[in-house]
Amino acid sequence: HHHSVWRQEIDARLKALLEWLRVRDLLAPEVQLQLEKMQAHNRSDKILVAFVAEFSRGKSELINAIFFAGFGRRIMPASAGRTTMCPTELAYDIRDPACLRLLPIQTRLESRSLMEWRLVPDQWVTIALDMADSDQLAAALGKVAETIEITIPEARALGFWHDGVPDKPLPTATGMIEVPRWRHACINMDHPLLRQGLVILDTPGLNAIGAEPELTMSLIPQAQAVIFLLATDTGVTASDLTIWREFLAGANDDATRFVALNKIDTLWDALSTSEQIEGQIERQRVESARILGVTEDRVMTVSAQKGLVAKINRDAELLRSSHLDA
């Protein structure tokens, strides 16, 4: 909702600026063209929000809680050991049926960019989604967790094995390397938020075995907002801080960076009062903001898993406690 209001505000401001320049005879043709282009971009364009985090911070679960609670079960793979292995976009294009499109990892052998691959739909594997069948939906979307085993020379060719780099992926017992089966996934489905032009990017955990940070990080600059997830019980770990500093901090527009402290339920404790628990959560929030160098209003606290359970069971009190009732 905020997003559509925000878009209308930008539209109104651009309109006012055009008018102001026109009245004062300051509207050069190239300026007018640029402003009109911005207007069109604002009206038609998608807003890309990327979820980024260290492995197992709950990115996919948060997406489940926000987008899939109505299906009465977990849809995106988010259980231990089954996790998003390739960047996965959630969007809605009214011209296409509900489907999952997958780009095979082997396309990395060619020099074409992801943008170019988007233009060759026949190179993608397309799976129809039955939005009325949550089991079929979950089984189909489980494909984003698929991996394949390849030889070391193949892994080298695909960019998953670099000689002389210390933290290479561990070969399996048979000397093979496990890599993501897919390079990129796109889910097209109808949802009120997606209908407004929101596009969600779920990314592989950044220290998942074989997950190439560049698979994820090349997409970050295109995002209008990035939500960085942390676990509340650990706060900002050394590896969280490395990811933040390396990929997310110091962007020319820090206003696009948000932090979600997930798993606040790990601090819920039968022996503490709810005031004590909220106090603990608040301290973690303030401390996380300080360590990451962001203002406190950029850090929100949630429990994706409890929020998902609360929505499925229609438990208003649990939903309030999960902070996902907003």
Regions found by a protein language model. Name each.
Residues 11-12, 36-326:
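Globular "head" domains of long coiled-coil molecular machines
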Residues 17-18, 29-31, 195-196:
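A short alpha-helix capping/helix-coil boundary motif
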Residues 1-26:
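Charged, amphipathic alpha-helical linker segments immediately N-terminal to NTP-binding catalytic cores
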Residues 23-30, 35-37:
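Solvent-exposed loop/turn elements at secondary-structure boundaries
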